[in-house]
Curated annotation (Swiss-Prot):
This is Large ribosomal subunit protein uL14. Belongs to the universal ribosomal protein uL14 family. PROSITE patterns: RIBOSOMAL_L14 (PS00049). GO terms for biological process: translation. It comes from Caldicellulosiruptor bescii (strain ATCC BAA-1888 / DSM 6725 / KCTC 15123 / Z-1320).
Length: 122
């Protein structure tokens, strides 16, 4: 569960290393976001010469959470960290590579480009 002020790792090569959630999209009173949800973030740590810089406000989709998510068959999938991938307004990823595993739930939320770039889909 990601909420405003939560910090997440960035799992792509846009140059951002860490972002902080500032808004959960999808309703005026929505408090939490899970895997596959879109959030508005502020870049808190970035590498020099990247696509984004520190202080930029960007949209991101959550690809891994410590909380995990329940699947249809009753199993749970959990990860070791909270991670997001930066996206454009049309939902395509801003980077050209994805690092680490991503959850299969992204396929249901129509983030097929992220799923195809990911090295492992769990």
């Amino acid at each position: 569960m990601i909420q405003p002020q939560s910090r997440l790792k960035v799992a792509d090569n846009t140059g951002a290393k860490e972002v902080m959630c500032i808004r959960v999209l999808g309703g005026s009173n929505r408090k939490f976001a899970n895997i596959g949800d879109v959030i508005v973030c502020s870049v808190k740590d970035a590498t020099p010469g990247g696509v984004v810089k520190k202080g930029d406000v960007v949209k991101a989709v959550i690809v891994r959470t410590r909380k995990g998510v329940r699947r249809e068959d009753g199993t749970y999938i959990r990860f070791d960290d909270n991670a997001a991938v930066l996206i454009r307004e049309d939902g395509t990823p801003r980077g050209t590579r994805i690092f680490g595993p991503v959850a299969r739930e992204l396929r249901d939320k129509d983030f097929m480009k992220i799923v195809s770039l990911a090295p492992e889909v769990l």
